[in-house]
């Protein structure tokens, strides 16, 4: 939520200001691909390394990239489930963020009791990611970014729309269709009526 110049400037004054911790956005996509998600972002690998250099603990926000890492497409989800069938897809992102030794805490936006229970299972105790798992998650990030989805996390900052459109719902439906490979090319396509009905009715 800030630019890199401000980050670097504030860290350059650590000897004087003595930061107790710094909050950064860190997840397995933003680790090396932050600019592909948002051109204003900086890779978490750089942000974290700068904190480590100064022995400043990191507080992690957006470990699930606004929930997107808990809603992977079926193909990517299956790859993670094959490795750890009993664990949620979200737990992979939390384990990634929690593996780094200078992480003080990982923030989690929880809506339901099931989210809290999943987080407790993931962190009590935390099983750090192996090098092989880091490689798998990097590959997952690269594959995820190849899908032509819209980077919407349903924050609703774009609402209300002056034309009465539910912008997040439209974008999320589009993303779901892309992820499922269910995008009709035109109104003559075999599955057009079915896809249209799914969008309008659910």
Question: What residue spans do the PLM features occupy?
Answer:
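Short, intrinsically disordered, charge-balanced linker/junction segments flanking boundaries
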Residues: 197-201
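Beta/alpha (TIM)-barrel catalytic core signal, keyed to glycine-rich beta->alpha loops juxtaposed to Asp/Glu
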Residues: 1-165, 169-172, 179-195
């Amino acid at each position: 939520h800030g630019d890199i110049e401000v980050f670097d400037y504030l860290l350059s004054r650590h000897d004087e200001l003595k930061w107790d911790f710094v909050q950064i956005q860190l997840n397995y996509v933003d680790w090396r691909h932050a600019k592909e998600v948002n051109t204003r972002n900086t890779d978490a690998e750089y942000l974290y390394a700068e904190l480590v250099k100064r022995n400043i603990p990191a507080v992690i926000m957006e470990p699930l990239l606004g929930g997107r890492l808990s809603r992977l497409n079926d193909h990517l989800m299956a790859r993670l489930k094959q490795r750890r069938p009993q664990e949620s897809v979200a737990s992979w992102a939390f384990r990634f963020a929690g593996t780094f030794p200078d992480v003080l805490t990982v923030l989690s936006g929880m809506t339901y009791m099931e989210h809290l229970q999943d987080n407790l299972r993931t962190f009590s105790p935390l099983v750090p990611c192996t090098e092989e798992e880091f490689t798998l998650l990097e590959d997952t990030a690269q594959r995820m970014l190849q899908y032509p989805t819209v980077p919407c996390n349903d924050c609703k900052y774009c609402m209300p729309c002056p034309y009465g459109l539910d912008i997040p719902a439209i974008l999320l439906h589009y993303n779901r269709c892309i992820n499922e490979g269910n995008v009709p090319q035109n109104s003559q396509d075999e599955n057009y009526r079915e896809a249209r009905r799914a969008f309008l009715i659910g």
